[in-house]
A protein has these predicted regions:
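Intrinsically disordered, low-complexity terminal tails/loops enriched in metal-binding residues
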Residues: 34-194
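Compositionally biased regions
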Residues: 10, 24-26, 194
Length: 194
């Protein structure tokens, strides 16, 4: 009949797409409902490999700093690590990020301080991998690292004096002297949130 509009139904292809999407949504909802246990929350991801026996850091391209999410493999001279008592190892883009995690493992590593086993850094002048508890730490020099003004690890008094002559040093401290309360005074960096 002229002037009368025929009823229009959606094309069959569109009906199939809507029907398929509804079925897929229902299947996904059922899978979530029957999944065993809670879905794990996002958090810090340990390195793909642990520290080597001599403390060497086998950093992979996928490893991310748990403090700032930068890629430690891009900064081999400044890379650092913390091994935990359960064998997990976290790699950091810089000694500063490692020190933040050492002071606040509950925030940055999702574990208590009792789980921290071995902090490792690369000594600035020699490149030697060392325990971070055995080095002198320098702040306030002219060295710039991945996160800005660097916190620099030095292995002994001779390296400290040579570094100081070349780069300056506002503060020198040991890891066991560093606390949340004196962080800003010793490092010259803003205090991490607690």
């Amino acid at each position: 009949m002229p002037g009368r509009r025929p009823e229009v139904s959606p094309p069959p292809k569109m009906l199939g797409t809507v029907h398929g999407a509804l079925c897929l949504s229902l299947v996904m909802l059922l899978l979530v409902a029957v999944a065993p246990g809670p879905v794990p929350a996002a958090g810090p991801v340990p390195g793909r490999q642990g520290l080597g026996p001599e403390g060497d850091m086998p950093i992979s391209p996928e490893d991310r700093c748990p403090v700032c999410a930068m890629l430690p493999i891009r900064y081999p001279r400044f890379a650092a690590a913390i091994a935990l008592t359960d064998g997990r190892t976290y790699y950091f883009c810089s000694p500063g990020c490692m020190l933040n995690a050492w002071l606040h493992p509950d925030i940055f590593l999702g574990c208590p301080a009792a789980d921290l086993k071995r902090p490792v850094v690369r000594e600035y002048l020699s490149g030697e991998v060392m325990d971070a508890r055995e080095v002198f730490w320098v702040s306030g020099s002219d060295v710039v690292g991945p996160m800005g003004p660097a916190l620099v690890p030095l292995k002994d008094q001779a390296h400290l004096e040579a570094f100081r002559r070349r780069h300056g040093a506002r503060k020198v401290f040991r890891l066991d002297e560093l606390t949340h309360d004196n962080w800003q005074t010793l490092t010259g960096k803003q205090r991490p949130s607690s």
